[in-house]
Amino acid sequence: YDKNIATGTNVPHFFTSRRISGYQGYGFHVPTQDLHDAFDADDPRITYVFTQTGDRYKGDTEAQDNAESPSGYHDYKMTVPAVEKTGFDVWMISYNIRLIRYSDVLLMYAEVLNENGKPGLALPYLNDVRERARKTNPIDPRRDQQAYIPATTTNTLPDITETDQERLKEIIWKERRSELAMEG
C-alpha cells in the first residue's frame, strides 16, 4: 500500500456518521427516522441500510455508538469496519461505490411499463426485486453483535398483484426507496 498512489476513496470518511466505532466520519449521510419507518418491520433489507447502537462488526473492539446521530441510526452502506481498513488511511479506503444496480434497472423498467399503461407487465420486474430482497439473510455475516434482527416470515415482502396504475406507481416508488436506500 502506498498512500501516494490513489487506490481508494475518501467518500466513506465524509458520509459515515460521527462516533462510528473506530472511525470518525463527518456525518453528511445519516439515515432519517422517516426512512426507517418506510420499511416494513420484517424487511430484511433494514439490516443492510441501518446500523444501531450496540451493533459490532467482527474484528472491531467496540460496538456502534449512535450518540451523535440525529436519528439514532448510522448508514450501514457507507460504514467500513475497522478490520477492513487495515493498511489504509482515512483518505484511501478500499470501498465499492455503487453507481447502478440490477435492481435499479428492474425498478426503472417496471416504472416505465406502468407509466405507459401496462401495469400488469410491470409486476414481474417489481416482484423480482422483492423476491431477491425476501431471500436476504436478516442476520449480517459481517457483524458479531446485531441490535435489531428483522423477524422475517413466509409472508415477508409478498408479491405485488396491484394493477391500478396510480397505486402501483406509489408501490414502485416505495420499493425503490427501500431497495436503494442510502445509495447514490
Give the residues covered by each predicted segment.
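Polar, glycine-rich mid-to-C-terminal structural blocks
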Residues: 1-39
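Acidic/polar-rich alpha-helix caps and helix-coil junctions
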Residues: 1-6, 41-184
